[in-house]
Each structure stands twice: as structure tokens, then as C-alpha cells.
Amino acid sequence: MTNIKSQQKRNRTNERARLRNKSVKSSLRTAVRAFREAVHAGEKEKAAKLLVSTSRKLDKAASKGVIHKNQAANKKSALARTLNKL
């Protein structure tokens, strides 16, 4: 346990941020998984809708600093390429 008051506060803040980031990343993985399942099943309309919502979640996570903006861009690009192959 730390002795410095400001470090104790940083520890609490970091723990809250870690839990928030964990939740956001989990929902991102779920969204990407749902998109890939729709593509695998050949449901192009459903996959297109899921691509829009997944892209939005990726952008939001990047703007909040949960993931890097380039990582979000790369994931969106890869998902769009997957959809266009259908």
C-alpha cells in the first residue's frame, strides 16, 4: 500500500479506468464476433448493419482512448474488406 495520498488516489482512478476499459473492450470483441458470425453465415444485410454498429463502437473506443485510433481504423478496414468479399 502506498503512503502518498496522491498515489492512493491515482490507484483508485486507474482501477476505475481499468474496469471501464475492460468492459468496452469486451463489448468490442462481442460486436466483432457477431459481425464475423453473420459473414460466415452469408447474411449480407445483417452483416452490413453490424458493420455500421461495430465501426461506431470502434470509433467511440478510439476517441475515449481505450484503443489507439490506428487500431480502430485497421479493424474497421479489415471488417469492411471481409464484408465486400461476400
Swiss-Prot record:
Protein family membership: Belongs to the bacterial ribosomal protein bS20 family.
Protein name: Small ribosomal subunit protein bS20
Record function comment: Binds directly to 16S ribosomal RNA.
Organism: Mycobacterium leprae (strain TN)
GO CC list: cytosol; small ribosomal subunit
Stored Pfam families: Ribosomal_S20p (PF01649)
Region (Disordered) location: 1-25
This protein's UniProt keywords: Ribonucleoprotein, Ribosomal protein, RNA-binding, rRNA-binding
Protein's UniProt keywords contain Ribosomal protein: yes
GO biological process, one term: translation
Single GO molecular function: structural constituent of ribosome
Keyword Isomerase in annotation: no
